[in-house]
Each structure stands twice: as structure tokens, then as C-alpha cells.
Amino acid sequence: MNSPLRGIWLWLPLLLTWRAPEVSSSWWYMGATGGSSRVMCDNVPGLVSSQRQLCHRHPDVMRAIGLGVTEWTSECQYQFRQHRWNCNTLDRDHSLFGRVLLRSSRESAFVYAISSAGVVFAITRACSQGEVKSCSCDPKKMGSGKDSKGVFDWGGCSDNIDYGIKFARAFVDAKERKGKDARALMNLHNNRAGRKSVKRFLKQECKCHGVSGSCSLRTCWLAMADFRRTGDYLWRKYNGAIQVVMNQDGTGFTVANERFKKPTKNDLVYFENSPDYCIRDRETGSLGTAGRVCNLTSRGMDSCEVMCCGRGYDTSHVTRMIKCGCKFHWCCAVRCQDCLEALDVHTCKAPKNADWTTPT
């Protein structure tokens, strides 16, 4: 028998442990500080003490993390390029994304996952390139191994992804581990899913040795795939993200809708439904879609109907320079002409009587 109190009990732990997140700075801002690691460590407000200690103790790792911010934010913007919210970052905002990620939404889940993955990727790459004193190539990949093609020798430089994951967990999760509220648990879950996603795409690369390429001896190593593979994977997880509530003892999650499966460690989880992101809203941090380019012939999320939220669009006639008449010349060049191409660009209208700032 289903009790009417059952729903109350499901939500009670969430209500008891929920606190509205505050707009605070994050390690995400490290990519904007520049300068030395000391400048970075001392000028990113919001770092907890253990993060600052790691920052001062490992300046070379912090440089890698700071450079990596540009990579994972660019990947986020690529994945959301055809959506109303396009993972836009805010200049001079210490939180990098503003208020939009205060909501425990699918978008927050994705950003926490992709940022955590980005840290693993950046640190691991820096280790392999000899840019970090405390790590190098994977020391476990030594001696011989065997695969479907036979025996091989471990050689080259296998990416030390275990070090990247370990450091990322210690640094990225530090602030969330200090909190016991629902949002902290959500962030920790999505951080872990992001870290695991990078390791999923480790690939074995080999080089043949022998007379005339006979491959009588193979040397192999493990290498991370391009970060786009991780971005594409997390994008699929975003589209299949699972809405959850806190369980009764407040230590984990249960699905909000019993028809859906329980989330695994690889799934992204969220608590709140997303806003529609149609209009500029200071409360939610949405910049709206006025001025966004839309696709008149598309039926997807980038269509003018969906992107512009039914407000209509303006059309501009523009010209652009393109390469044309390209010919191959022996040997070995391709020569092209410069041509002008005329095209129509469609941009979403702003809401009527709105105090509007066109998003960038």
C-alpha cells in the first residue's frame, strides 16, 4: 500500500540538508588569474585551506590546472553551442559562470563533471610532458604485456592517469567534502563521474620494430584520447542525467521517479529542473537568447523557433571571405582563391520592453 506520507519522507532529508548555495569564487577562476603560482594561490578567493596548501606546495600542477580551464570551458561551449544556455563564462566574475550554476540542474551537473575531467586531463598531460616534478610517466607500465596481437614490451611514456585522478580528487573535491548538504553530495558524485570518464578513453598505442617493418617486436604505451572524446561522452551523460532526491538517512540519493533506474557512478545526477533560459533573468543568472544566431532550416535546439523561444528573429545580409577554386599543385601545395560569399544571418529578437544586454 502506498502511503501519502511516502513522498514527504523521500523529500524530508533533502529539505533538512538543503542550503541555498552562495555565489562564491571557485578554483575555476584560476584560468583567469595568470602570473605566477603564488599570485594564483593568493588571488583566487573561495579556496579552502587544503586547496591553498596544495596550491603553494605544487605550483607546477597549479599552472597545468590553470591552463586546463581554457580547454574544458571551450569543450563545454562546444557541446552547448546549439542550446539556449551555451556555457558562456563571465569576465571579471570570480565564479566564472555567475548565478546560473546555483541551481542544482543538469547544466550544473555537466559543468562539475567536465571541469573535474579537465583537471585530470591537464595534470596527466603535464606529467607526461615532464612539466610536473612530483610525477612522470606511469611507473606501473614496465616489462612485457600481452594483447590480441601477441606479446609486447611496455615502453615509451604511458600517461600517468592514476596520478592525475588522485590529485584531482584531493584538490577539486576539497571544498565539497567540507559540506554535508545535498548540493555538496551532488557535486562530489558528478566530480567523480567526470574523473572516471577520462580513464575510460585510455588507448594503447604501439610502435613496430624489425626488419622492413616486420613488427617482430612491439613497444606499446597507454595514452589519453583527445579531450573531445570525454566531452562527447559526458554530453551523452548530460542528456541521460538522472533526477534524484536525498535518501532517508541523508547520505545518498534515490531516484525522484521510481520508473527510472538508480544512478551508477558513471551517471550525472541533478535535483532541480532547469529554467528555460529564454530571457535575461538576474535571479537565475540566465542571459537569455536575444541576439543569438539561430538556424532557420533546423528542427533541432538551434532552430529559430526553439532558440528564440517563439519571439521571432531578425535577418541580416552579410558577406564573408572564403577560400574557393582550390587546386592541388605538384608537389605539394594547395592554392586557393579568395572569394566573397553572401549569406543571411538570423538572430533572435529581444523580448519586448526588456532591459536587455545582448549576450556574447
From Swiss-Prot:
Keywords: Developmental protein, Disulfide bond, Extracellular matrix, Glycoprotein, Lipoprotein, Secreted, Signal, Wnt signaling pathway. Its main location: secreted. InterPro entries: Wnt, Wnt2, Wnt_C, Wnt_CS. A lipid is attached at residue 212 (O-palmitoleoyl serine). It is found in: Secreted, Extracellular space, Extracellular matrix. Glycans are attached at residue 295. GO terms for cellular component: extracellular space. GO terms for biological process: animal organ development; canonical Wnt signaling pathway; cell fate commitment; neuron differentiation. Belongs to the Wnt family. This is Protein Wnt-2. It comes from Plecturocebus moloch (Dusky titi monkey).
